[in-house]
Amino acid sequence: MGVDIRHNKDRKVRRKEPKSQDIYLRLLVKLYRFLARRTNSTFNQVVLKRLFMSRTNRPPLSLSRMIRKMKLPGRENKTAVVVGTITDDVRVQEVPKLKVCALRVSSRARSRILKAGGKILTFDQLALDSPKGCGTVLLSGPRKGREVYRHFGKAPGTPHSHTKPYVRSKGRKFERARGRRASRGYKN
């Protein structure tokens, strides 16, 4: 009697196309599919993979982080490429001259980059500008920056856990006594 093979782990779960029905995103996917196939550069393959990603995996990149990353040695006169949104950061006083390519740039970030004499490209312009991704720096926002990640990890209330508990309210009466202070039972 033969043993049936388990087929439940056969399927590789990864996106082969974006979930979104946005026609402009679909056109970019078409373009970068072609480039990823016809050029031998990993840059195009990475951009294509990131175009498929969900919004939570394409976190916004702040202007301050981008400036910090572009100031690193050897990154002068390079194009910052972000498969996502670039947002403004009011904490930054002066913006240097930057050449940027992104899916979206928030209105205030856009005006500040252009005011500094910078240049903002779209991905189809980038494909003409550097089809192999030469002279570019691929950047992305902090994926773990979302508030929800503070609730993940060791259970709140266990020793050395810094996990945020899901609490109805942050008042005096809510998860503040037992386990939080030595005078009330114990402190973790």
Curated annotation (Swiss-Prot):
The keyword Ribonucleoprotein applies. SUPFAM superfamilies: Ribosomal proteins L15p and L18e (SSF52080). InterPro entries: Ribosomal_eL18 (IPR000039), Ribosomal_eL18/eL18-A/B/_CS (IPR021132), Ribosomal_uL15/eL18 (IPR021131), Ribosomal_uL15/eL18_sf (IPR036227). The modification Phosphothreonine is found at residue 158. There is a cross-link at residues 119, 164 (Glycyl lysine isopeptide (Lys-Gly) (interchain with G-Cter in SUMO2)). Residues 151-188 are annotated as: Disordered. PANTHER family: 60S RIBOSOMAL PROTEIN L18 (PTHR10934), LARGE RIBOSOMAL SUBUNIT PROTEIN EL18 (PTHR10934:SF2). Component of the large ribosomal subunit. Belongs to the eukaryotic ribosomal protein eL18 family. This is Large ribosomal subunit protein eL18. It comes from Canis lupus familiaris.
